């Protein structure tokens, strides 16, 4: 799962990143195109990383601990695998040849060739740059989903509460990619305010049905720094999760479900200096000269998600060892599985 995650995340900062550098030469058109091209991977990351916070409404006993190691995958809807190129949306970017349906980063191979046409009305000249549209990484993946591994430590608190901490140290790749995660969540029991009654011996009955509320915040820093130049891509993702949880908890098994809300914010900055060579032509298509242009820090992009979510899952409990899995219905459905340890 870790290898799969690195392939998906770092592909847009390293190998596939080089494919759409030429887009930056299209001035303001670049932000529109790159936003559409990269949107599914960032939306998927926000949904995937904001999952798997809880596996029961029952809080951990005060000052006891639970360690969960899980992996989530946000499945990319088919309509996010490509986008239609509408010439009216762009000032300089055009299709040279090929279909106007262009793959996103989570799509397949591209069959489209693009061109940038910048007219100079004063001298009746045009600047022309041609290149292949970037392709996607769908064929490199076992399933078309954006993955997100997570390690979470939880501690029980007094008053029927629990705190969750997520942390991933900075992961780096040989080509300059990096990733770091930090998140915190709090769960509070609602069912504790409803008495369960007493048995025939005067002892409190065992509670099997539990209700709780949970809130969480998470931040991710990731990106790519070219070790041989000043080029870089820096990504920051912040997410918020609010949910109500219900669970049936028995000695060996917990069945849980939740209904909640997800909110996410993402920024991506493309930094550095990029040089481009234009073929300058007259209005009849005759070559006049080659002109080189430099562009610095070409992109600052913003993405956001918000919406309701509903989840169902189970947890198998074997002494101190646990196995859990669940599925969340939302814009990008998320499947989660993992193991846990209680101590």
Residue ranges and their predicted role:
Residues 20-195:
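Transmembrane beta-barrel domains of Gram-negative outer membranes and organellar outer membranes
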Residues 20-45, 73-122, 224-318:
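Outer-membrane beta-barrel transmembrane domain signature
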Residues 61-63, 144-149, 177-184, 207, ...:
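Residues that define the transmembrane beta-barrel architecture of outer-membrane proteins
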Residues 56-58, 67, 151-157, 184-190, ...:
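Residues on the lipid-exposed face of transmembrane beta-strands in outer-membrane beta-barrel proteins
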Residues 71-75, 167-171, 190, 215-221, ...:
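Transmembrane beta-strands of outer-membrane beta-barrel pores
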Residues 76, 160-165, 193-197, 252-255, ...:
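Repeated loop/turn-to-beta-strand initiation elements of outer-membrane beta-barrel proteins
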Residues 76-80, 174-177, 197, 220-224, ...:
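Outer-membrane beta-barrel proteins
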Residues 1-22:
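Bacterial Sec-dependent N-terminal signal peptides
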